[in-house]
Amino acid sequence: MFKVQILVNGTNCDILEHEVIKMPGQKMPTYPAIELKRFTGLEPLIAPDGCAVGKLTDFWSWAYSDLMGNAERGALAEYIVACALGIETKKRVSWDKYDLMTENGIAVEVKTSGYLQTWEQKALSKPIFGIQPTFGWDSKTNEYEAEKKRQSDIYVFCVHAHTDQETADPLQICQWEFYLMPTKLIDEQFGNQKTVTLASLVRAGAEKCEYSDLKNRIYAVMQK
């Protein structure tokens, strides 16, 4: 029996169970987890005739340049927090139960929002974050946990706070704001709530933190 988690617009919606039928005498194939390789970006894209048609950096530029979009902006925020924690050399694991793991074993969930979007807006967006409990997935075993809960020890809420379209640049960390809240406090304040606004987080005690202090403050908050 294996489970598949379905997501719609980044929201965990349901868990579907599927049974693998093993026929008598049939040997089930085993495919161990693939060890992730960190690419440099210089790797060539090879055509059937053996000629290079581009480099991996060309693909990255083509696919992931929308840093104002919610998907790429979210991945960028994870990398920014990883840099602050000094763990940026570790490879990102998509769909893992938490986003980052500090050197001393603190599981970190990074959530991202912003006031500006890539599409035409009638008004600035209101920062809102997904905080729904989930069934944790283990990337090594491909199994889901039985208990639905928030998987990390602490949340880092990242807000791209810039509001001028002409100068907006998510690569400028000075345009970001960071707020910390331990998962225990989120559970106490918001229960099984799926989303939360920035204003609600601040009222509930989220700590605003400078980028340069993220690592020390995360460690300090978790020691309380």
Features from the language model and the residues they span:
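Nucleic-acid endonuclease domains
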Residues: M1-I106, K111-K224
